[in-house]
Design a protein with these regions (language model features):
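Glycine-rich phosphate/adenosyl-contacting loop at the front of the ribokinase-like
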Residues: 1-16, 20-25, 32, 51
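Ribokinase/PfkB-type carbohydrate-kinase core domain
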Residues: 18, 24-42, 55-179
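Short, glycine-/polar-rich solvent-exposed loops and beta-turns at beta-strand/coil boundaries
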Residues: 44-46
Length: 179
């Protein structure tokens, strides 16, 4: 979202942060670059999520992620006016673990499509795909116009042995895949 806003585009963030220092900094920094940010701030003690990313010189990444309160995304968090006003809805696969989050994804996608908008999904990592393969396949086939994934994520999604087979499968399922 910050990249889109930094290049002059309009961007909005739908999600959750806590009323803690990381949530405050996250919100401040998004707003500072022009991202519309009205997050859900749930009651309770679950802190704002965080992630440490290590990138090696050969461009491999290792991530240590705690999703925190962001994992509590639910349909009530989806601002329909924001989704309807956007051109592309971008959904983060890491948030797909809970049943309420799955409902939120489907709801947001339905709102986007009802307003003629495109829906995109990032597969996030192959372990995430392994956990949600059947649901992701259904989501990709039924709701997703643009799919973001890497080599390993696509192989996992389609349970095939070669990248060429994965590419052929994704071409059948969605309009555009960004690998």
């Amino acid at each position: 979202m910050t990249g889109v806003a930094s290049f002059g585009g309009t961007a909005a963030y739908i999600g959750k942060v806590s009323s803690d220092s990381l949530g405050d900094v996250f919100g401040h920094d998004l707003r500072a670059v022009g991202v519309q940010f009205r997050p859900g701030r749930p009651d309770g003690d679950t802190p704002t999520g965080r992630c440490i990313i290590v990138v090696t010189p050969d461009a491999e990444r290792t991530m240590n992620t705690y999703l925190g309160v962001s994992s509590l995304l639910c349909p009530a968090d989806i601002d329909e006016a924001t989704v309807a006003a956007g051109k592309v809805l971008y959904m983060e696969g890491y948030l797909y673990d809970r049943p309420e989050a799955k409902e939120a994804f489907r709801h947001a996608a339905a709102v986007a499509h009802a307003h003629g908008r495109q829906v995109s999904l990032t597969l996030s990592d192959s372990f995430c795909v392994d956990r949600h393969r059947a649901d992701f396949r259904s989501l990709v086939t039924d709701e997703v116009d643009i799919l973001f994934g890497n080599h390993d994520e696509l192989l996992s999604l389609y349970e095939v042995g070669s990248f060429d087979e994965a590419v052929a499968a994704v071409q059948r399922d969605c309009h555009l895949a960004v690998v």
